[in-house]
A protein has these predicted regions:
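Loop-helix junctions at membrane interfaces
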Residues: 1-204
Length: 204
């Protein structure tokens, strides 16, 4: 009898784990869908006009910076990736641009969620540092590929190769993506407000 009890233990644990994951799946999908829509809106509609070379400042960073702290990694990563892709695809269709812009914004933004999530158990100061690091990553994730694409005339970025000096000059405006740092206090404020409202650190 003892042997039978021992052998059935892992099976019961495995079954309960599967059941829990199955139960959590609708919530996970709903969260990702909701936040993806929010991210898409922040990439397309919710933006502030700015003078060149910025042209505009989107509100999307507020959402994915805060969500990456408060919610599970899968939620923050996939909602940032999908929402940014959908939003940028709309921008390309409506305002013009190249399809690679969609891949580019996912490449730049989605890892930000992972960077911030890594430090979400830390103090407020660590959260701020993680958001700064994420924004620096985003900036260079835009800048270095664009520099290469302009230099070698890849993906229709230029009719003729611009050379590395010319490519650097054309991609230089990407460095102004660092303006997203202004959203960090807003994101931190949102995190603090949600934590106080729900009396919990994370909405896992």
């Amino acid at each position: 009898m003892a042997t039978a009890d021992l052998s059935s233990g892992p099976k019961l644990n495995s079954s309960s784990t599967i059941a829990r994951r199955t139960t959590d799946l609708p919530l996970l999908v709903a969260q990702i869908a909701s936040f993806s829509g929010l991210m898409a809106a922040g990439t397309t509609i919710l933006r502030i006009p700015a003078p060149p070379p910025l042209f505009e400042i989107t509100l999307a960073p507020v959402f994915y910076l805060a969500i990456s702290v408060l919610f599970p990694r899968r939620v923050s990563f996939w909602s940032t990736a999908l929402g940014s892709a959908i939003g940028e695809a709309i921008n390309v269709v409506v305002y013009g641009g190249f399809p690679i812009y969609v891949a580019g914004i996912v490449w730049a933004r989605a890892p930000e969620a992972l960077i911030i999530y890594k430090f979400r158990n830390g103090s407020t100061r660590m959260l701020i540092i993680s958001m700064v690091l994420a924004t620096i990553y985003e900036t260079f994730a835009f800048f270095f590929p664009d520099w290469l694409f302009y230099s070698l005339a890849l993906f229709s970025y230029s009719d003729v190769p611009q050379g590395f000096a010319g490519g650097f000059a054309l991609a230089f405006s990407d460095l102004f993506t660092m303006v997203d740092l202004v959203w960090i206090p807003v994101a931190i404020g949102a995190v603090v407000a949600v934590r106080k409202a729900f009396r919990t650190r994370f909405l896992d």
